[in-house]
From Swiss-Prot:
Active-site positions on this chain: 8, 69, 141
Binding residue positions for Mg(2+) 2: 69
Enzyme Commission code: 3.1.21.10
GO biological process, one term: DNA repair
Protein name per the record: Crossover junction endodeoxyribonuclease RuvC
Cofactors that this protein relies on: Mg(2+)
Cited SUPFAM superfamilies: Ribonuclease H-like
Binding site for Mg(2+) 1: 8, 141
Major site of localization recorded for this protein: cytoplasm
Organism of provenance: Wolbachia pipientis subsp. Culex pipiens (strain wPip)
HAMAP family from the UniProt entry: RuvC (MF_00034)
Amino acid sequence: MIKIIGLDPGMSKTGWAIIRLEEKNNIKFLGGGTISTDGKLGVGERLHIIFEQLKKVIFLYSPNEAAVEKIFINKNPKSSLTLGYARAIAILILRMTDLPMNEYDANYIKKSITGNGHADKGQIIFMVKQIVKSSNIKCHHTADALATAICHAYTKNFCFMGIGS
């Protein structure tokens, strides 16, 4: 069975979600959460927290593939730069654990999940809950990571080729 980790990197909050592709094109939500870092800490300390927590998640769930939301350029260059740091840490841990990785634009993820490339957070949360048949997804960072993982499964056609079974 294929397990996919989806990541929504951020310096303050990094969302993660793990799905498993099952028989009959079902997608099972195995776990998800948000890695939070305190803004009072230095950049190095915050990045270390993200790195260590992601490493624990990867070793706990042993995913086969990874999907990461691509960076978007914010109006505030400092925000874009710190987002880039968090993405770099996420990509580094995926590389260190030999996980094949794909990156997806936020609008592409939204369109693949909701049919609308400009869907809002509420629409994404609603749709991922429907797809994985779970009401346990409350945080939008986890929902975004879950949407990224589902988007990867759809894009790679795992669900439609019977590979998950």
